[in-house]
Amino acid sequence: MHLSLLVPFLFWITGCCTAEDPVTGPEEVSGQEQGSLTVQCRYTSGWKDYKKYWCQGVPQRSCKTLVETDASEQLVKKNRVSIRDNQRDFIFTVTMEDLRMSDAGIYWCGITKGGLDPMFKVTVNIGPAIQVPITVPTMPPITSTTTIFTVTTTVKETSMFPTLTSYYSDNGHGGGDSGGGEDGVGDGFLDLSVLLPVISAVLLLLLLVASLFAWRMVRRQKKAAGPPSEQAQSLEGDLCYADLSLKQPRTSPGSSWKKGSSMSSSGKDHQEEVEYVTMAPFPREEVSYAALTLAGLGQEPTYGNTGCPITHVPRTGLEEETTEYSSIRRPLPAAMP
């Protein structure tokens, strides 16, 4: 009878030992400071639709839950820890980023259910960050090369201006013999002493040509202006009109009454007449004087053209030596209506 009770008990013990655990994972994982680590926890197919979580600390029933899924395959992240459930392969993955030395300790992979949750213990180890030596590359020594150039100048006198022809040549490098370099420097100073006088002569010649050109331009402008006498001649063709009033010649006291009576009839008729004289104008407004002689008392007034300068009219024996003066001025132009 005791044996019949012992056999079922042994079968129960064997079944319990061979049964599969609800959740499993790595017992220990390691990471470096300022780095990251990943933990994969497996579960049986019967726990597919349950929530999975990652908690820290001991004992396991009072550990601190860091992150938990929502029974789906969506990624859930909280602070530096994230979790994702792959319900096709029955694996949920936990990732810890920016690791610190204080993150080392005991963690648990767990599944939420009513009562006691199936859990699996994982030990996390954190090592110090690896110091990577910084290598500063050294620059190779810099070697400089000095090149001396010689400029040869040839002056050709086949034209009005000298032609400068320059030849370029390389006499040597700094890496060569020092004696050759000194010869090149001496040739350069020699060519410079020849080149400077040539350039000065060219500049002097250009200055001389410019002065000659300016002198010719001034002379041409003076010729174009012309002498002032031509301008005076151009005014001689103008006509000037002047009003002349004739005065009676002086007579003796005895004959004054006779002449006055004889001229009373003819003098009144011609007193208001106007004398016109064609005069050549002068550039300046000057006063001209004309010597006029009067004929007999019975003669009509005489019209005459007087040119400048006015000459004296010859006198006859019958005429009296009386000279009349008149002021002739050029009239002003009439204003426009």
Swiss-Prot record:
**Tree of life domain:** Eukaryota
Processing after translation: Phosphorylated on tyrosine.
Query: Which intervals of the chain are annotated as region Disordered?
Result: 248-270, 318-337
Tissue expression profile of the protein: Expressed in myeloid cells. Present on the surface of macrophages (at protein level). Highly expressed by alveolar, splenic macrophages and bone marrow-derived dendritic cells. Expression is increased following aeroallergen challenge in macrophages, mast cells, and eosinophils.
Q: Where is the composition biased (Low complexity)?
A: 252-266
Chief localization? membrane
One GO MF term attached to the UniProt entry: interleukin-4 receptor binding
Q: Which residues form the signal peptide?
A: 1-19
Which loops or segments lie on the Extracellular side of the membrane, by the record?
A: 20-193
Record localization: Cell membrane
Q: Where is this site: Phosphatase-binding?
A: Y241
Report the induction information: Up-regulated by interleukin-4/IL-4.
* Record-annotated membrane-spanning stretches: 194-214
Region listing for Plays an important role in murine norovirus (MNV) binding, in residue ranges: 39-45
Domain Ig-like V-type stretches: 20-125
Describe its function: Acts as an inhibitory receptor for myeloid cells and mast cells. Positively regulates the phagocytosis of apoptotic cells (efferocytosis) via phosphatidylserine (PS) recognition; recognizes and binds PS as a ligand which is expressed on the surface of apoptotic cells. Plays an important role in the maintenance of immune homeostasis, by promoting macrophage-mediated efferocytosis and by inhibiting dendritic cell-mediated efferocytosis. Negatively regulates Fc epsilon receptor-dependent mast cell activation and allergic responses via binding to ceramide which acts as a ligand. (Microbial infection) Acts as a functional receptor for murine norovirus (MNV). Mediates binding to the cell surface and is both necessary and sufficient for viral entry and replication. This interaction requires Mg(2+) and Ca(2+) and is enhanced by bile acids. Primary determinant of MNV species tropism and is sufficient to render cells permissive to infection by MNV. Can render nonmurine mammalian cells susceptible to MNV infection.
PANTHER family reported for this sequence: CMRF35-LIKE MOLECULE 1 (PTHR11860:SF101), POLYMERIC-IMMUNOGLOBULIN RECEPTOR (PTHR11860)
Which protein family is it in?
Belongs to the CD300 family.
Q: What is this protein called?
A: CMRF35-like molecule 1
Q: Which organism is it from?
A: Mus musculus (Mouse)
Upper lineage: Eukaryota, Metazoa, Chordata, Craniata, Vertebrata
